[in-house]
């Protein structure tokens, strides 16, 4: 995906402006639509230390997939697979990448799917978010999880919304970015709480069910 001059400048400037520009990238929705009676195969890559990746981030990505699957029972039969066989693939953006999250459509054995790229480096999101992530591991993990959830939503065919209650909200519409993440983080007590706190709004659930009806 091309990155605009403004987005590159915002990243260089740091702070919440950079965060907003990076999160607001208009990732197009993939053409993957509806249940096709085949498992939804997925692959979660390892990341490099310079990318900000931590080994436990792979579990956050799995939890995000499971949250979408729970939202539409029986429709998304998740199955781990080799990279070359996976319909949905999750990667961790390198440190020199100018995007925060991105989804790229791909085709696997004739099935339409997506490669998802996640930035795990909190320092790239500005001083306030970076410092808070160092003090509070759950803050960092909340952001990584929500980013996975958002980009995997694109992989499942969902586009952006203008409602800040939605995980598919587009930050280009404005709003308090720190508060957006804090609203999810605040009720969490342990990391395991993330697995049961989907982060999906009623509208998110309705939209994914329209594309992938429960069975």
Predicted segment positions?
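Residue-level detector of alpha-helix boundaries and kinks
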Residues: 52-53, 137, 192-193
């Amino acid at each position: 995906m091309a990155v605009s001059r403004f987005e590159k400048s915002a990243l260089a400037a740091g702070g919440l402006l950079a965060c907003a520009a990076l999160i607001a990238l208009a990732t197009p929705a993939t053409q993957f639509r509806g249940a096709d009676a085949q498992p939804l195969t997925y692959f979660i890559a390892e990341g490099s230390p310079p990318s900000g990746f931590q080994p436990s981030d792979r579990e956050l990505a799995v939890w995000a997939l499971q949250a979408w699957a729970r939202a539409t029972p029986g429709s998304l039969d998740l199955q781990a697979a080799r990279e070359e066989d996976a319909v949905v693939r999750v990667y961790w953006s390198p440190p020199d990448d100018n995007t925060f999250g991105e989804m790229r459509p791909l085709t696997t054995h004739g099935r339409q799917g997506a490669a998802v790229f996640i930035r795990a480096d909190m320092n790239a999101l500005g001083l306030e978010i970076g410092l808070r992530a160092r003090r509070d591991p759950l803050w960092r993990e909340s952001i990584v999880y929500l980013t996975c959830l958002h980009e995997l939503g694109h992989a499942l065919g969902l586009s952006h919304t203008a409602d800040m209650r939605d995980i598919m909200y587009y930050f280009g519409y404005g709003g308090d970015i720190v508060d957006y993440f804090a609203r999810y983080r605040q009720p969490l007590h342990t990391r395991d709480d993330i697995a049961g706190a989907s982060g999906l709004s009623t509208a998110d659930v309705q939209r994914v069910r329209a594309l992938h009806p429960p069975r």
